[in-house]
Swiss-Prot record:
Residues 823-888 form the HP domain. GO terms for biological process: actin filament severing; actin polymerization or depolymerization; barbed-end actin filament capping; imaginal disc-derived wing hair organization; ovarian nurse cell to oocyte transport. This is Villin-like protein quail. It comes from Drosophila melanogaster. One of its GO terms (cellular component) is cytoplasm. Keywords: Actin capping, Actin-binding, Developmental protein, Differentiation, Oogenesis. Germline specific in adult flies. SUPFAM superfamilies: Actin depolymerizing proteins, C-terminal, gelsolin-like domain of Sec23/24, VHP, Villin headpiece domain. Belongs to the villin/gelsolin family. Transmembrane segments: none annotated. GO terms for molecular function: actin binding; actin filament binding; calcium ion binding; phosphatidylinositol-4,5-bisphosphate binding. Gelsolin-like repeats lie at residues 307-366.
């Protein structure tokens, strides 16, 4: 596919700028310093914004934000400027923000000014084009407590009355609207109406608890000294007569029309899309975009350092990557070409456009590429323990040092008690205790593990955080029935715990380090459709003949997996072959640690013999002829389909698994072993997302530069560590029972490389394990115990707040029954709309259920009773009343 863009379609044309002089205001910025600065462009004026006004914008202006931080760190509005040595690597970001009502002159001016700033800073900054209400996660991270957008049309108007929209979960946006009208109301929002003598806080019925809490905080900060009255969506008539009369002078209740939350869905459509297209930009008289024939983007697709590539996230965001050897003119014109692409594709005008430069790509860009390995080199956290042997010192260190536990993903040293259950079909069978643990690929296994902390110090015990882990392991050939039964059994075990615990759901191929550690790196995975455990009841020895490939070189990353056929053998591999004798074969390029792990697996089967490549006896070749052949062994790297078992990989690729049959699990294809444990490369930087359900779809906001204070008790979060996806459940979060659905939906829709078989972990607030806490700076175990819900905040406001009938006189919440909640969930219309002829009704109204679209106030006014009372009436009576009031 090819697109062609003419010069007239671009927003930025460098050749029209005769002389790129740098504004004197920009020259005050230290070039090699950690810093944060904001400038405002109002017509022809560029002025620096005072620090006290950071986070306040006018919708008629354009703004420029510059943020510089150490690599891997994040700047924000509180960052203090600090000079750095020339050899210190900095990340630089330039954002230009356009208000909803910004003039074309301001748009043009800001485009020129960012080129000046970029040039002054050495043309190495990433540039983001931001628009009001659709800002990037990085922009939002600069303002931890949210930001305010004031109306430029009201600059010269009286201070009161004013109307504000307050919404967004993590970063509260307060938007001042130019007119006071019902058209600005939405059931998703909290609305604030400020008058000279009173502040109304209108609570949209679809707003979340965290939005309501943030809104009350905002009101108390911005409306101090003014009496506050809280008005609930649909219950406006319950205001006192005095307050209602004042309200009606500005927002007549007879004209009430509030948009339903569902009308905002278009704003979020495909918000979590993980689909991408890559175009190569070519200048052939005019700009041509040649689409590359790729699926999931790979770093190798950006192969031309002299060129420019465009990454299209189907209208959600447009990224321009400029090669390190591309002409300067291409770097300058990249943003304009991105804007022209948006217009050509008829994407929304507020689509995010970002320009990045080779060697200076932000992490948000790098993670879009599943195989961008060198992106993680700057990550300060490795995932390989310092030692491959765990003595008392190491075990104790894991207990007292959460960061070490998080880096290694080891809760303890794996010496605690374990109980194993095998789930096959609908049968759950406890596995006899044995040093030899064998899993089969056609079944699921549930492991209940008791955490063992090598200390009695209370602080260290609190640091570990949990006492039990429930692991659910699903084989690659396990049926849907087996996985479903294991899922129910594991969840019931987790939900029934009497002590702090963690639930981990994982698949073959994705075993995390601690899971392998509890088996001391000697877990055996057998293939084939076995319905019984392959044990001899008397000797507890493995029966029949088989071939095991041993992956890994340490107890936390090793396991042995059965292979049924070999096409080649690498000299880096180790195998255990069970025939009439047990043989441990080690390639000449295998490491000493890998050989030790192979010998440990062989020892489980009894007397064994170590065989080194090149020193095989005739007896060996005769014994293993059905599996091994000298012609298969390829010296050195060879062409083995398995990856090297290098000192820290612990994973390879097994290309000869038995075929899946029947109804099998939706995991990664069983013919590829990838990333089974601790990788040779550092893990990706950890990501934190606030997640919630909206109309059966999972939505999420990324929180860059996170800390523990970003976790709210009434929310659910995803912590993505790369190898394990944690679901953190706040103590008062809704939908807690859907924790696995949350994680699975996230993995399937994340806009970067993830497999559906990624391991998932569930942790609850105040029961966080050390492997989770260690990803946060200065974790406080008691943080959040003084959390105040919206209902409690509303109650605690006491005499400061005058509430309508939703709350009793003493401020306690009126508990609505489920029928009343269902009633409040419907879109509301004025009575005049609902009594129209059927063909005149809005399309989302069921003519037989018109009454549910009345507000509570209108319902009581019409029927002289609440909906709950109405719903208790006999069917004939309800029908008679609806006919009487023309609602049928």
């Amino acid at each position: 596919m090819e697109l062609s863009l003419s010069p007239k379609e671009t927003e930025i044309r460098p050749n029209t700028i005769p002389d790129l002089k740098v504004d004197a205001t920009f020259r005050k910025v230290a070039k090699h310093a950690i810093t944060f600065a904001i400038w405002k462009i109002d017509e022809d004026r560029l002025e620096a914004v005072q620090r006290s006004h950071y986070g306040t914008f006018y919708d008629s202006c354009a703004y420029i934000i510059y943020a510089a931080s150490l690599s891997g760190h994040y700047a924000n509005h509180e960052t203090i400027t600090r000079e750095q040595k020339p050899n210190v690597s900095l990340e630089r970001y330039i954002h230009y923000w356009l208000g909803k009502n910004v003039s074309e002159q301001n748009r043009s001016n800001v485009v020129h000014k960012i080129q000046e700033l970029d040039s002054y800073l050495g043309n190495i900054s990433s540039i983001y084009r931001e628009t009001q209400n659709l800002e990037s996660a990085r922009f939002l991270s600069y303002f931890k407590k949210g930001y305010d957008v004031r109306s430029g049309a009201l600059i010269s108007a009286p201070q009161r009355p004013r109307l504000f929209q307050l919404y967004a979960r993590k970063w509260l946006r307060s938007i001042e609207v130019a007119t006071i009208d019902w058209s600005h109301f939405n059931s998703d929002y909290v609305m604030v109406l400020q008058t000279d003598n009173l502040t109304y806080v209108w609570i949209g019925r679809s707003s979340s608890g965290i939005e309501r809490r943030s809104a009350l905080d905002w009101v108390q900060k911005h409306c101090s000294g003014s009496p506050i009255t809280i008005v609930d969506d649909g219950y406006e008539q319950a205001m006192s007569q005095e307050h209602k009369e004042l309200w009606n002078t500005m927002l007549p209740l007879k004209k009430r029309m509030v948009c339903q939350a569902s009308q905002l869905v278009s704003e979020y459509a495909d918000y979590n899309s993980n689909k991408f297209r890559i175009y190569k930009c070519n200048q052939r008289g005019r700009l041509h975009l040649d689409q590359l024939d790729v699926g999931m983007p790979a770093k190798d697709d950006l192969s031309d350092a002299h060129g420019v590539y465009l990454l299209d996230n189907y209208g959600q965001s447009i990224w321009l990557w400029v090669g390190g050897q591309a002409p300067q003119a291409d770097a300058l014109s990249a943003m304009g070409n991105g804007r022209a692409f948006v217009k050509k594709k008829k994407y929304p005008d507020n689509t995010l456009v970002v320009r990045v430069l080779e060697g200076h790509e932000p992490v948000e860009f790098k993670r879009l590429f599943a195989n961008w390995l060198n992106v993680w080199q700057e990550n300060t956290r490795g995932h390989k323990p310092v030692s491959t042997k765990f003595g008392k010192l190491d075990a104790h260190s894991l207990c007292e040092r959460p960061k070490m536990a998080a880096d290694t993903q080891l809760v303890d040293d794996g010496r605690g008690e374990r109980v194993i259950y095998r789930v096959f079909g609908d049968q759950v069978q406890e596995v006899p205790i044995s040093k030899t643990v064998v899993f089969t690929t056609n079944a699921s296994f549930v492991v209940k593990y008791s955490v063992q902390c090598a200390t009695v110090v209370p602080a260290d015990l609190a640091s570990v955080g949990i006492k039990t882990i429930i692991y659910q392991w699903n084989g690659s050939e396990a049926s849907v029935e087996s996985i479903s039964r294991a899922d129910k059994f594991a969840k019931a075990s987790f939900d029934g715990l009497k002590e702090p615990g963690m639930f981990v759901q994982l698949y073959e191929f994705d075993e995390p380090p601690h899971f392998l550690q509890i088996f001391e790196g000697k877990l055996i995975i057998r293939r084939g459709q076995r319905t019984e455990m392959p044990y001899n009841g008397n000797s507890n020895a493995l029966l029949d003949t088989f071939l095991l490939k041993v992956y890994g070189d340490a107890s936390y990353n090793a396991k042995a997996v059965e292979e049924t056929h070999l096409s080649s053998i690498s000299s880096k591999d180790c195998y255990v072959i069970k025939t009439n004798h047990v043989w441990v074969w080690c390639g000449q390029s295998s490491t000493g640690d890998a050989r030790e792990m192979a010998k440990a697996v062989g020892a489980l089967m009894g007397e064994n013999s170590l065989v080194l490549e090149g020193k095989e006896s005739k007896e060996f070749w005769q014994s293993v002829a059905m599996y091994f052949n000298q012609t298969l062994v390829i010296n050195g790297n060879g062409n083995s389909c398995s990856s090297s078992t290098s000192s820290s990989s612990g994973a390879g690729s097994m290309c000869n698994g038995s075929s899946n049959g029947g109804n099998i699990s939706p995991t990664l294809s069983n013919n590829c072993y990838l990333n089974t444990s601790v990788p040779s490369k550092p893990r990706p930087p950890v990501q934190l997302f606030l997640v919630w359900w909206q109309q059966s779809s999972l939505r999420y906001e990324e929180i860059l530069g996170f800390d523990q204070q970003d976790l709210s008790s009434d929310c659910t979060y995803i912590l993505d560590t790369g190898s394990l996806t944690y679901v953190w459940l706040g103590s008062q979060a809704p939908n807690q029972e859907r924790y696995t659905a949350i994680a699975q939906s996230y993995v399937q829709n994340a806009p970067f490389g993830r497999r559906s078989a990624t391991a998932l972990a569930v942790v609850r607030q105040f029961q966080e394990p050390n492997v989770f806490k260690g990803f946060f700076e200065s974790w406080q175990n008691d943080y959040g115990k003084n959390f105040h819900s919206y209902e409690k905040m509303r109650k605690d406001l006491g005499n400061k707040v005058t509430s309508n009938c939703c709350f009793a006189s003493e401020g306690s919440a009126l508990i609505l029954n489920n029928r009343q909640k269902d009633f409040d969930g419907h879109k509301k219309y004025p009575l005049t709309v609902l009594i129209q002829e059927m063909d005149m009704l809005p399309p989302d109204i069921n003519p037989l259920k018109r009454e549910v679209h009345l507000t509570h106030d209108d319902f009581v006014s019409v029927f002289n009773m609440s909906f709950y009372e109405f719903d208790e009436l006999p069917k004939w009576k309800k029908m008679e009343l609806k006919k009487q009031f023309k609602l049928f």
